[in-house]
């Protein structure tokens, strides 16, 4: 579930952003953006010239110079506004998280067990290793691990999901988050962080982005923009002696206007906003990224490691068929399978009971009246079953049943081996049923591939992204499901060590790898992956190892994370293309206006037939400022994203933003020139 989205121009955010835009006019803030710092200096210089002209200290048109100066200041303000609005949206999201933090007291236990004596202490004084007791109605005071008890927990304040979740000691569901509420029962929790280091604190810090560091691509683009600015600065500086030598020196105001229009102010003014908005969009998808670097890396990912269960398949395997061994009828197999599953509360176990009922009208027996001994499944035995009336019935994995049969002096039939292979090749999971040492047959558990997932993988393939399915199934089952789902490769019988080795192998080939995980055993692979999305329902170790946390705990979200990362990179690239190409139109507007008096031949470049030199220069400066405002929605929302190959995406962006950047300024400058002329302002 996603959080409520803020309107693009929320009135309160706009007002706050306008205030922040004015505050950012100080030199220290401007220095962080070299391109806009040049505009700021130009604004200051033309302001001083305007004052000097107005006072008579300098010759020239004070009104024209003041108009240029005013619009240069507006250009700086608009760039500040874009950044402030993006930051304001992030801070608004952070404020909603701050509302979760409440000043509360915690019951700190003197001993790590339920019922021990407790001291009431402020929650913000809890340290790592402290043990606390929380009961129904309490707010969990710290991040930690459940060491005793089990409870229903409302995590909606963090995740936005209203459905409660179960948290209990042991396993992968022992991690709890400070700020969530206990709905029932009780938990004894060991705090895993010190004050100020909780998941909620880190979320707020990341979302606010007060100390947002530039990403590598952002730094590289900034260097390019600085280089272009220096080139245009030197080129503009050389124009004054040329015009002076021609007998009609161009004014400093016009040269400043020319410089500002030629340097890439559009992308320079929107660059920070694009980065902040990328992290904000990620939060809109209920994913917390540790940094802009993580969001950017998501856009460069070219290998996705996807867990089969829950990501590629629905995750609830259902019994689909009873396949009896030679000499055994299907009803006998179904009866034994149902008996072995009566106490099995897993979805698979319940589906076996239901299938036997549907196929042979074998009604579900009353467990209490059977006077039977039920054998639960364990990781060691990998079997479960029932002992009843001198009958010992078991169901389990092929290897486990084979060992059981041989241990009881029996022989595993070759025809059952063939049936097991047949089930696995069809993409189902085989469970074998045995009574005593006699193998009765095979149950096929079918895991349903999610609808539309094959098409999504085809889109990823077009984008040059390789998909790899990770599963604990045997190779035959894994190969069948991989073929049905349309993934490029698979890792069967996966272990944490195998996943880690696979990630390192791809990285050694120069690829960027993304994966999801939720358990402590996933932590090494998460730490190694370039993009590691930890599930919020997972362990603390997994969340600390990842560089993103999915608050919805939805493994499929990894594909959306990649889309958001690519959208941010595309937005930056598209607006850079637009910014650089629209300099061409400004060149045709300002160069003839500024130098035609000295070099009449340049009148041939006045293809827009602008009214006068003053209106041409002022129109270009006004357009240069206004285009930043018009592009703010695109910077915040991101460009329209379509899954295409890199070459197709490049062609599309060049046509839309390259050609658009070339044509829009011609139209915009001409319209502004007409308006200025009609209104008699030039």
Curated annotation (Swiss-Prot):
Coiled coil: none
HAMAP family found in the cross-reference section: KdpB
Organism this protein belongs to: Shigella boydii serotype 4 (strain Sb227)
Binding site for ATP: 344, 348, 377-384, 395
GO CC field: plasma membrane
Location relative to the cell: Cell inner membrane
Name of the molecule in the record: Potassium-transporting ATPase ATP-binding subunit
Catalyzed reactions per annotation: K(+)(out) + ATP + H2O = K(+)(in) + ADP + phosphate + H(+)
Keyword field contains Transmembrane: yes
Binding-site positions, Mg(2+): 518, 522
Topology within the bilayer: Multi-pass membrane protein
Keyword annotations: ATP-binding, Cell inner membrane, Cell membrane, Ion transport, Magnesium, Membrane, Metal-binding, Nucleotide-binding, Phosphoprotein, Potassium, Potassium transport, Translocase, Transmembrane, Transmembrane helix, Transport
Subunit structure: The system is composed of three essential subunits: KdpA, KdpB and KdpC.
């Amino acid at each position: 579930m996603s959080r409520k989205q803020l309107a693009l121009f929320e009135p309160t955010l706009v007002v706050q952003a306008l205030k922040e835009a004015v505050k950012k006019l100080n030199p220290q803030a401007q220095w962080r953006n070299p391109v806009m710092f040049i505009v700021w200096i130009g604004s200051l210089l033309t302001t001083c010239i305007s004052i000097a002209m107005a006072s008579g200290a300098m010759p020239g048109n004070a009104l024209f110079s003041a108009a240029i100066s005013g619009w240069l200041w507006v250009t700086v303000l608009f760039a500040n506004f874009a950044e402030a609005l993006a930051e304001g949206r992030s801070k608004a999201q952070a404020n909603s998280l701050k509302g979760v933090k409440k000043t509360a007291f915690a019951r700190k236990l003197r001993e790590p067990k339920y019922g021990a004596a407790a001291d009431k202490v402020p929650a913000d004084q809890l340290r790592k290793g402290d043990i606390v007791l929380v009961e129904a109605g309490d707010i969990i005071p710290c991040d930690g691990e459940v060491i005793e008890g089990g409870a229903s927990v409302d995590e909606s304040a963090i995740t936005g999901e209203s459905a409660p979740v179960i948290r209990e000691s042991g396993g992968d569901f022992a991690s709890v988050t400070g700020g969530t509420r206990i709905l029932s029962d009780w938990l004894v929790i060991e705090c895993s962080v010190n004050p100020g280091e909780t998941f909620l604190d880190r979320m707020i810090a990341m979302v606010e982005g007060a100390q947002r560091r530039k990403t590598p691509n952002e730094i590289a683009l900034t260097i390019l923009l600085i280089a272009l600015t220096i080139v245009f600065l030197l080129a503009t500086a050389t124009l004054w002696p040329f015009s002076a030598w021609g007998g009609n020196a161009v004014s400093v105001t016009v040269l400043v206007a020319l410089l500002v229009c030629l340097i890439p102010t559009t992308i320079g003014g929107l660059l920070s906003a694009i980065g902040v908005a990328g992290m904000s969009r990620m939060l809109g998808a209920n994913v917390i990224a540790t940094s802009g670097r993580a969001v950017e890396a998501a856009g460069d990912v070219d290998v996705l490691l996807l867990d089969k269960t829950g990501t590629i398949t629905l995750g609830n395997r259902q019994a689909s068929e009873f396949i009896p061994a030679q000499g055994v009828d299907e009803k006998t197999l179904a009866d034994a399978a149902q008996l072995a599953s009566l106490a099995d509360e897993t979805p698979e176990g319940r589906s076996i009971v239901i299938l036997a009922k549907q196929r042979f009208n074998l009604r579900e027996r009353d467990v209490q009246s059977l006077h039977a001994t039920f054998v639960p499944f364990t990781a060691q035995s990998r079997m479960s079953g029932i002992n009843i009336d001198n009958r010992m019935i078991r169901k389990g994995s092929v290897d486990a049943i084979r060992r059981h049969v041989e241990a009881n002096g029996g022989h595993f039939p070759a025809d059952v081996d063939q049936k097991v292979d047949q089930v696995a090749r069809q993409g189902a999971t085989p469970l074998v049923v045995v009574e005593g040492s006699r193998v009765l047959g095979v149950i096929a558990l079918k895991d349903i591939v999610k609808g539309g997932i094959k098409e999504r993988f085809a889109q990823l393939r077009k984008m040059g992204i390789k998909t790899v399915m990770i599963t604990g199934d045997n190779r035959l089952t894994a190969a069948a499901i991989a073929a049905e789902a349309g993934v490029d490769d698979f890792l069967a019988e996966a272990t944490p060590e195998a996943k880690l080795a696979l990630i390192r192998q791809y990285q050694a080939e120069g690829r960027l790898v993304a994966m999801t995980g939720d358990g402590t055993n996933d932590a090494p692979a998460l730490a190694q992956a370039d993009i590691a999305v930890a599930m919020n329902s997972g362990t603390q170790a997994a969340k600390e190892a990842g560089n993103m946390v999915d608050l919805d705990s939805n493994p499929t979200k990894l594909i959306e994370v990649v889309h958001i990362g690519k959208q941010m990179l595309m937005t930056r690239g598209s607006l850079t293309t637009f910014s650089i190409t629209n300099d061409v139109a400004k060149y045709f507007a300002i160069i003839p206006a500024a130098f035609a008096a000295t070099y009449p031949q340049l009148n041939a470049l006045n293809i827009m037939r602008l009214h006068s030199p003053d209106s041409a220069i002022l129109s270009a400066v006004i357009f240069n400022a206004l285009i930043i405002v018009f592009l703010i929605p695109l910077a915040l929302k991101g460009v329209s994203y379509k899954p295409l190959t890199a070459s197709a995406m490049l062609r599309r962006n060049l046509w839309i933003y390259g050609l658009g950047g070339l044509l829009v300024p011609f139209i915009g400058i001409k319209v502004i020139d007409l308006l200025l002329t009609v209104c008699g302002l030039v």
